[in-house]
Amino acid sequence: TYYADETGARVEGEWIYTVEPSTAEDDADADYYYYYLLSSGKVASGKRNNIKGQTYLFDDQYRMLSGWVRGKVGSDGKTVYESIDDEDSSVVIESDSSENYTYYYCGGSDDGHVKKDKWIKTWRPADTYEEDEDVDQFWYWIESDGKIFVPSNSDADKVAAEKWKLEDGELVIKANYESVTKKKVNSKDYFFNENGEMLSEFLYVLEDSKDLKEGLYYFGGSDDGSMKTGAETIKDDNLDSFKFYFETKGENKGVGITGNKSNKLY
């Protein structure tokens, strides 16, 4: 497939914003999409790693994808990419070894390049279309290859945990997670649930694992998420302050203590 401009010349090495090939441009109801014409004049498809210095993903209709994107390796070994945040989306990000999905975030419809090596805060795919500010958004970590970090099913560091909250001066259980995973990002430790969402506030790990010990951990507020160590003053829902201490090193790093520490009781 090629594309000719209004003079009839074949377009090469450029973006075009137009309707699908089978649609008339004067169709008032037609949807417009971005396409990229390679130096050969052919329309780009799949994953393209160096379009003006950026990586872009295209679906099987050659359309540039934006927002949440999912890749799946087919029987021919090629990866097919698709948008997963449209109006009818019910997609849940998760690690599924039987499907071998990979997930990406490609910004807005006028942007489209794959984000890499950075944090993003956004809605889950099924909630993205509405962009409802009353619906929770979550932090996700994007690896240097553009893939959203989602803990694998084989991750040896996955453990069950409970989300605790400090209310009226007491720690109470608010939610249960079948599995959480510890990951180091930019020299700091973070915990993620099975959907790749960064966790925050208090978590109680219910069992020992290879690199995690049972106990209470604290990760700061919802826009922080890094595991805390040492002395911390934390406010409850009434804004009353309470002091905690979390181990600073060794196999118990991050675990809250109960008892005497440096002549102080916690």
Model-predicted regions and their roles:
Residues 1-266:
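Extracellular adhesion/carbohydrate-binding repeat motifs centered on closely spaced tryptophans
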